[in-house]
UniProtKB/Swiss-Prot annotation:
GO annotation (BP), single: regulation of DNA-templated transcription
PANTHER family xref list: TRANSCRIPTIONAL REGULATORY PROTEIN YEBC-RELATED, TRANSLATIONAL ACTIVATOR OF CYTOCHROME C OXIDASE 1
Protein name: Probable transcriptional regulatory protein Cphamn1_0542
Pfam families, alphabetized: TACO1_YebC_N, Transcrip_reg
One GO CC annotation: cytosol
Upper taxonomic lineage: Bacteria, Pseudomonadati, Chlorobiota, Chlorobiia, Chlorobiales
Organism annotation: Chlorobium phaeobacteroides (strain BS1)
UniProt family annotation: Belongs to the TACO1 family.
GO molecular function, one term: DNA binding
Localisation per UniProt entry: Cytoplasm
Coiled-coil regions listed in the entry: none
Disulfide bridges in this chain: none
Amino acid sequence: MSGHSKWATIKRKKAATDQKRGNLFTKLVREITIAAKTGGGDPGGNPRLRLAIDTAKMNSMPNDNIQRAIKKGTGELEGVTYDEITYEGYGPGGIAIIIETATDNRNRTVADVRHIINRNNGSLGENGSVSWMFQRKGRLEVPRDGVSEEQLMEVLLDAGLEDLDSEDDNCFSVITAVKDLEAAKKALDEAGIGYENAKMDMIPDTLVEPGIDDASKAIKLIEALENCDDVQAVYSNLELSEQVMNSLDS
C-alpha cells in the first residue's frame, strides 16, 4: 500500500488554513445527515455518525447545527434527501481520481462533475475503472508535538495500526482498517495523545508522478472538483516530484 504522497501532505496543510468555512460546514452537515439517515441518530451505535460529529466539533461547528443535521437525517425535522454517488475517472498525466458526492439532484451533479473534468483535461470513467487501485482505510493525523513515533507505535500496536507515515514534518499519519479506526481513537484518548482529522480515506496502492505541466493541471482539476458544491471528497494517486514541489513553493 502506498499513499505517502507529498500531494496528500500539501492538501492537509491547505485544509488546515482553508477559510471557506461555509463550504466546509455544508459538507459536514450533509455527512451527518446521511449518516443519521442510514444508521440512526444515536452516535453510540452508529460509528459513521460518531465520526462525522467528531469531525464537525473539531472544525468548531455549533452543536445546534449538528443536532439539526441529525434530526433531518432521522426525519424528526424536514430536510433534503441526499443520494451518495461516486464517480471515477482519470486526470492529466494519467492520474486516477475518485469523486464522492452527496446530491439532491443527480442530473445536476453528474453534469457539473463531467464539465469540471472535461474542462481540466480529464476523462470520466465507468464505475470500477479506477477504484481497484485504492483501498478504503481509516486515517488519523497526530501532531508531532510531545509524542514520538515509538510512543505511537506502542499505544496503537494492539489498536489496529496498519501503517504509520512519518514523512510530514508536522504530524504523523496513522493508517488503520476501517473497522479499527474507533479502536485507534480510543487508544489515543486513553493515552492522552491528541489527534485531528480522523476520517475514512481511499489510499492508492501506487502513486503516479506526472511531469511538471501535467502535475499543475492535475492539481487544478482536483481543487476544482473539491470546490464543487455537491462533492464531499476527492481521492487520487497523484504524487509530486521535487521539481513540481519547488515550483509550487516559488
